[in-house]
């Protein structure tokens, strides 16, 4: 195999006993690739490992985990200053892997690793909330956020993305819409939202296409609001074709402002953020990511 620059894999601590991954890394090392491995234990580890990666001079930092791990690693990368900032590689090892799935990262570990190390590095956007928290995939609000936040880990491990739907059905009696006002470029809406999706990527919640037209390098955020009087039809509508659905409001903008009379919660790549005021803006070409040539989220 041709020579490739060194990489550093930041592995979510939950995946340390993954024997096939260990074997795949050993095989690539035997082929001459330099792959450093670091394991996260607590929040902040990824940022420290990215600093170490820069000192090692690696070309790629690989996020090994789910959407939360990808978020933490990509956030640390965009905060780097100077030249020679490593590209982001993705090794999907989480429950839902929404971002990795939507950009067509291979499911096979060996293929995903090779792409993360040797794939083309393409500039992609990220999004920032209130000038602080970032997300690479999607911000979701409404009852969907509460479902994904509260779904038990054992249920997610057993059933994957379907677990969110099952838990949502179990919680329907306590889920209410969120009243809010949303503004963007040439966009204004106010009312009761059952689900809010603001996407740099397209899917969340274990495979639900909340923002099916989103692209990760167009400098825009895609917005979708699901409205209606009943929770169950809205939940079901995310599973089927929604063409000409009167309960769906759509918009696109480089920024959105959300105001609510009460505290609401957004889920940012799996991390909850609560408040009454949110300013969400796109950060164009914020980092480079190694993606497959058939990635459908590129313009």
From Swiss-Prot:
Binds 1 Mg(2+) ion per subunit. Ca(2+) may be able to substitute. GO terms for cellular component: cytoplasm; plasma membrane. SMART domains: DAGKc. It comes from the Bacteria. It is found in: Cytoplasm. ATP binds at residues 40, 66-72, 95. Its cofactor is Mg(2+); Ca(2+). The active site is at 271 (proton acceptor). One of its GO terms (biological process) is phospholipid biosynthetic process. Keywords: ATP-binding, Cytoplasm, Kinase, Lipid biosynthesis, Lipid metabolism, Magnesium, Metal-binding, Nucleotide-binding, Phospholipid biosynthesis, Phospholipid metabolism, Transferase. Mg(2+) binds at residues 215, 218, 220. Probably phosphorylates lipids; the in vivo substrate is unknown. This is Probable lipid kinase YegS. It comes from Escherichia coli O17:K52:H18 (strain UMN026 / ExPEC).
């Amino acid at each position: 195999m041709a020579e490739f620059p060194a990489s550093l894999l930041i592995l979510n601590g939950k995946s340390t006993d993954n024997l096939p991954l260990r074997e795949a890394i050993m095989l690539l090392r035997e082929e001459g690739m330099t792959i450093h491995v670091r394991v996260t234990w607590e929040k902040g580890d990824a940022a420290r490992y990215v600093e170490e990666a820069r000192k090692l001079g690696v070309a790629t930092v690989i996020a090994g985990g789910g959407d939360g791990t990808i978020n933490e690693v990509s956030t640390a990368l965009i905060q780097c200053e100077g030249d020679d900032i490593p590209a982001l590689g993705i090794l999907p090892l989480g429950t839902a892997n929404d971002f990795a799935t939507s950009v067509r990262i291979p499911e096979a570990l060996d293929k995903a690793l090779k792409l993360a190390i040797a794939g083309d590095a393409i500039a992609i956007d990220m999004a920032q909330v209130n000038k602080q928290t970032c997300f690479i995939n999607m911000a979701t609000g409404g009852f969907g956020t509460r479902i994904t936040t509260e779904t038990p880990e054992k249920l997610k491990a057993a059933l994957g993305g379907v677990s969110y739907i099952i838990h949502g059905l179990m919680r329907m009696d306590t889920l209410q819409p969120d009243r809010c006002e949303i503004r963007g470029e040439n966009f204004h809406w106010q009312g009761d939202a059952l689900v809010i999706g603001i996407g740099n990527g397209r899917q969340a919640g274990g495979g639900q296409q909340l923002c099916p037209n989103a692209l990760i390098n167009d400098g825009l955020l895609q917005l979708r609001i699901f409205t209606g009087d009943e929770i169950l039809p809205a939940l079901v509508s995310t599973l089927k074709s929604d063409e000409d659905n009167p309960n769906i409001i759509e918009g696109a903008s480089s920024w959105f402002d959300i105001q609510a009379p009460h505290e609401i919660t957004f889920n940012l790549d799996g991390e909850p953020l609560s408040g009454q005021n949110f300013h969400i803006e796109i950060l164009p070409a914020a980092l480079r990511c190694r993606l497959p040539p058939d990635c459908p989220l590129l313009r």
